[in-house]
UniProtKB/Swiss-Prot annotation:
Catalysed reaction, written as an equation: a long-chain fatty aldehyde + FMNH2 + O2 = a long-chain fatty acid + hnu + FMN + H2O + 2 H(+)
Oligomer and partners: Heterodimer of an alpha and a beta chain.
Any single GO BP term: bioluminescence
MF annotations from Gene Ontology: alkanal monooxygenase (FMN-linked) activity
InterPro entries tied to this protein: Alkanal_monooxygenase (IPR033924), Bact_Lucif_Oxidored (IPR050766), Bacterial_luciferase_CS (IPR018235), Luciferase-like_dom (IPR011251), Luciferase-like_sf (IPR036661), Luciferase_bac/NFP (IPR002103)
One Pfam short name: Bac_luciferase
Annotated function: Light-emitting reaction in luminous bacteria.
Tagged with keyword Manganese: no
Keywords assigned: Flavoprotein, FMN, Luminescence, Monooxygenase, Oxidoreductase, Photoprotein
Source superkingdom: Bacteria
Species, as recorded: Aliivibrio fischeri (Vibrio fischeri)
Gene name in the database record: luxA
Protein name as catalogued: Alkanal monooxygenase alpha chain
Length: 354
C-alpha cells in the first residue's frame, strides 16, 4: 500500500494569497513527519480554484525542504507549454532530488489556459498524447526532435541525463478515450475523486482488457485513486467541515471553465459535458446536493467509515496507491490533525484487494 497527499492550493473566500500560500508551505513542511509516501501538486491558472501555476517550481521547493518525501505533479497541463522545456524541468528535478520526482500530467479543462498560452483547445487531446510520448521517449534516449502536426524542431541532446532508470509518471484519466490510450501505452492512470465505485471498477476493467491485449503486465502498473478526505471521531463534524470548504470550492471549479455552459461548442470534451448533464439530471448542480454526493463517495467521516469507503474501491479496482486531499478540514492545525488520524486510524487497517 502507498499513501499520498494532494494539495489543491485553493484560496478560500476572505483569505489573501499570502495567507493561503503561507499556510500551505507550512503544512507541506510539517506533513513530512506524518508518514505519507508522496506529495502531489495541481496546476491551475487565472482562478482562485488553484494558486499553483508552475508545478515544477512548487515541486523544487518541496523537494528542497525534504530528504525522503517523493513529490509529484498531478498534473502539468502538458499541451500548454513547449515539450522540451517540460522535459528539461523533469530531468533537472529528477537529478537534483535523486529520483524523488513523479511527473504527472493532465490534458487541461480550462478555456483561459488555452487562450492565453495560444493553444487550440479542440486539439488538446492529440497535442497531449504527442507531447507526452515525445517526453517519455526522450527520457530513455537522451535526445528529442519533432516533425509532428503540432510542433517541429530539430534533433537535440537534452541535459541533464536521467538519474532514475524510469522516471515515475502518471496521467489523470476520466474519459474512455484517455483510458484506452493509456492502456495501449501501458501507462498509469490517476482516477478522480468525483466518480463512485462502480465507475472506477468499469474504468479499470476497460483499461485492463486493452492493456492485456497490447501485452502489458497489468499487475505492474501503479495506478492511483484520489479522494477528498476528512477523518474525525465525530462523523457529522467531518461532514460539516467539508461542506463549508467544498461549497465554495466546487462553485469555483464550475466558474473557472466555460466547458459546462450549454452554449459551449468546444469539441473534444464530450465526456465532461455528458458528466455535467448527468449531474444536472441528478440535481448535483445544486451546491448542497453536489457536496452531499461528494461526501458520500469520499472518505469523509469516522475512521471506520473512511476505511469502508476506500476498501470498497480497493477491492473493486485492485488499486493500492491511495492519495487524499485534506484542505477541506479547515485551519492548518486541523488539516494536520486529520492527516494524522488518517495515517494512524485508517491507513494501517486497509488491506490488499480481495
Amino acid at each position: 500500500m502507498k499513501f499520498g497527499n494532494i494539495c489543491f492550493s485553493y484560496q478560500p473566500p476572505g483569505e489573501t494569497h499570502k495567507l493561503s500560500n503561507g499556510s500551505l508551505c507550512s503544512a507541506w513542511y510539517r506533513l513530512r513527519r506524518v508518514g505519507f509516501d508522496t506529495y502531489w501538486t495541481l496546476e491551475h491558472h487565472f482562478t482562485e480554484f488553484g494558486l499553483t501555476g508552475n508545478l515544477f517550481v512548487a515541486a523544487a521547493n518541496l523537494l528542497g525542504r525534504t530528504k525522503t518525501l517523493n513529490v509529484g505533479t498531478m498534473g502539468v497541463v502538458i499541451p500548454t507549454a513547449h515539450p522540451v522545456r517540460q522535459l528539461e524541468d523533469v530531468l533537472l528535478l529528477d537529478q537534483m532530488s535523486k529520483g524523488r520526482f513523479n511527473f504527472g500530467t493532465v490534458r487541461g479543462l480550462y478555456h483561459k489556459d488555452f487562450r492565453v498560452f495560444g493553444v487550440d483547445m479542440e486539439e488538446s487531446r492529440a497535442i497531449t498524447q504527442n507531447f507526452y510520448q515525445m517526453i517519455m521517449e526522450s527520457l530513455q534516449t537522451g535526445t528529442i526532435s519533432s516533425d509532428s502536426d503540432y510542433i517541429q524542431f530539430p534533433k537535440v541532446d537534452v541535459y541533464p541525463k536521467v538519474y532514475s532508470k524510469n522516471v515515475p509518471t502518471c496521467m489523470t484519466a476520466e474519459s474512455a478515450s484517455t483510458t484506452e490510450w493509456l492502456a495501449i501505452q501501458g501507462l498509469p492512470m490517476v482516477l478522480s475523486w468525483i466518480i463512485g465505485t462502480n465507475e472506477k471498477k468499469a474504468q479499470m476493467e476497460l483499461y485492463n482488457e486493452i492493456a492485456t491485449e497490447y501485452g502489458h503486465d497489468i499487475s505492474k502498473i501503479d495506478h492511483c485513486m484520489t479522494y477528498i478526505c476528512s477523518v474525525d471521531d465525530d462523523a457529522q463534524k467531518a461532514q460539516d467541515v467539508c461542506r463549508e470548504f467544498l461549497k465554495n470550492w466546487y462553485d469555483s471549479y464550475v466558474n473557472a471553465t466555460n466547458i459546462f455552459n450549454d452554449s459551449n461548442q468546444t469539441r473534444g470534451y464530450d465526456y465532461h459535458k455528458g458528466q455535467w448533464r448527468d449531474f444536472v439530471l441528478q440535481g448535483h448542480t445544486n451546491t448542497n446536493r453536489r457536496v452531499d454526493y461528494s461526501n458520500g463517495i469520499n472518505p469523509v467521516g469516522t475512521p471506520e467509515q473512511c476505511i469502508e469507503i476506500i476498501q470498497r474501491d480497493i477491492d473493486a479496482t485492485g488499486i493500492t496507491n491511495i492519495t487524499c486531499g485534506f484542505e477541506a478540514n479547515g485551519t492548518e492545525d486541523e488539516i494536520i490533525a486529520s492527516m494524522r488520524r488518517f495515517m494512524t486510524q485508517v491507513a494501517p487497517f486497509l488491506k490488499e484487494p480481495k
